[in-house]
Structure formats: C-alpha cells, structure tokens
Amino acid sequence: QLTPPIPADNAAAGTTWKQWRKEFWGWGDTNASRIAAAEKYANAICDSIDKYGYDGFDIDAEPNFAQPFATDKELWTEQGVMPAFVKTLSKRIGPKSGTNKMLVVDGEPNALPDSLGDHFDYFILQAYTTTSDYELNDCLAVQINHFQNKMSAEEVAKKIIVCENFENYAAKGGVNFTTKWGTTIPSLLGMAYWQPTYDGKTYKKGGVGSYHMEYEYGQSSAQTTYPWLRKAVQIMNPSIK
C-alpha cells in the first residue's frame, strides 16, 4: 500500500480514509491538481518497482465490471487523469521506457483511449469460460476495432494474453472447449492452441494465462506442479528434444 496510515491527529479529528488519501496525494478540486496527483501516484508506483526489483506493473482496467468494493472510478471519470497516469508510468516502465520493465493492462484495454495502446507490453483479457476459437476471436476483434486507428491488427494480436479463471476451474484446466478440429479439451489448452484470426487473417498472440494460477499448485503429483499451465506452455513453445 503506497498511501501511509492516517496520522493520529487527523484520525482524531474525524478524517476518513478517503479524505486522507486525497489529501496525501494532492487530489484537490481542480482538474490540474487531480492530474498532478495521478502523476505523483504513478511515480510512487515506479519508485516501488525500482526499490524492490519488480518486473513491472499491471493496471486493472475494469471501469465497466462490477466490483466487490466501493469505488468512485475517479481515474476514469476525471478528464485527462487516466492518460496522465499511463503516460507517467510509461516513462519508467513499459515498451516506451527502454527499461525492460513491463507495463500491462488487464480487463478492458478498450476502455483506455486508443492513443495509449502502444504504451503497454500486453493486453490481458479475462476470457473466462470461453468454449471455442470463435469466442476468442470475438474478444480479439473488440480490441482490434478499438485500437485500429493507432495500431495494426498484428500489433494488437501480439499483445493479447487470454486467461482462464483458475479460482473456479484449476482442477480441470478450465471448462470444455471445442477446438477447430472438433475435439473437446480444457479451455486453457484451447486458448494455447488458438491462433488469433481477424478479417480472414491469422496472427500470433501474446500468450495465455490463468487467474489465481496458485490454485493449480498441488493439483497433481508432487513431481508435476502446475500441470495445465505446463501443458499450455508446451503447446505454444514445445521443449527441444
């Protein structure tokens, strides 16, 4: 957590966490102050990445998803704030930074302005319980159509990582997925076999993943941990024998 605890004096005076958070980062009543606060927060994130040697940062972009907590979605609703946040991050992490630190967006990349697409290494899509290549191609098309004025279909496809929900489906590797050959396999493996197709052309994807990958640990013998993820890796990038 980047925001420090509420000072005792403030807490005694009745300051709420929401009030303190805005006060600490400088989020005031003006648009300029809010943009500055977002930039300050972005730099604090990058400072932590540098300090602890992290690989990068994942923005959960979910403005249209239901959330289990209260949120005012101010990064999304305040004009210019989200672009300022992303652009500040991208100076120190991501493909524009030259640092080999990753900047990825998870959830709804298409909720961001199309001008920000090339600021990210990957677009992570929560393609949970998809059952066919057709559904995955529909997910792909949403992103390609959104970014089409700034990025080619190939550039978008290369950033796409599709994920299954292992919080619910780790034991079976996902839900039943029907391949283009008509066979039924676990959806994570279907995602691994999937070749992104748009407007009749096939492209390379960024990869696949799983939400709560740790739930798969111990699903098989002690000699083979993470069996479904390992199989997915082998499908996409077979070991040299």
Predicted regions and their residues:
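Aromatic-rich peripheral "rim/lid" segments of glycoside hydrolase catalytic domains that contact
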Residues: 214-241
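Chitinase-like catalytic core of GlcNAc-active glycosidases
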Residues: 1-164, 168-186, 190, 202-205, ...
